[in-house]
Amino acid sequence: MDMELTKINFKPSFFSDRPLELLSDGEFSAIAFRYETGVCGLKISNKKCNMVVLPYMGQQIWFAEFNGKNLTQKSIFDQPQNTVKFGDNYGGLLLHCGLTNINCAESDEDYPLHGELPFANYQDTYTGIGRDQKGKFLVVGGTYDYRNSQEYHYSYSPQLRLYENSSVAEMHIDIYNHRQSSLDYMFMCHINWLAVEKSRIVYSAIKDRKHI
């Protein structure tokens, strides 16, 4: 079946220190609030999960709890900081990284760590209820338009889906190139899981500049 989607668009003025429920539909809920630092947060939940998305700060997923278990890394940040510097706000679960660059800038280069996406200020944001072949879902999404007069003009549109009675969330991403020339891009879905006691990290990439 084709996807069905009913959107509720919102804007920064909807967010304050008094939580505002933007959507309530059965087990689904979307609540807008503002942290003490001034950062906008959107708490979404179903019967099994709750997550906090930062709609105007790169659409980062700041926090996620599934089946009563916190999945988010422990850090020195108890809430998101009002900054655009990667290291000054490294506390969330998921960050979109890239697109025009992704690594650390050299001394003669000028671009932010992990590109422009982690702290992108989205022009279009929404929540809503949708349905596809997997069932009914709560959605949070938006579009970030990046313009550079000499090289780039693209739209980046992530969409986070939380399905009914499910402990699985899905991230869908669309990238649209507005120029006639091809768009060369780099992307990383940067996920910071909470460490599990006695866990073991398996690293398989060859350790040289060609593979890393």
Where are the regions a protein language model picked out?
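Hydrophobic beta-strand positions in extracellular immunoglobulin-like domains
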Residues: 174-175
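Surface-exposed acidic/polar loop and edge beta-strand patches at domain peripheries
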Residues: 1-164, 168, 181-186, 193-212
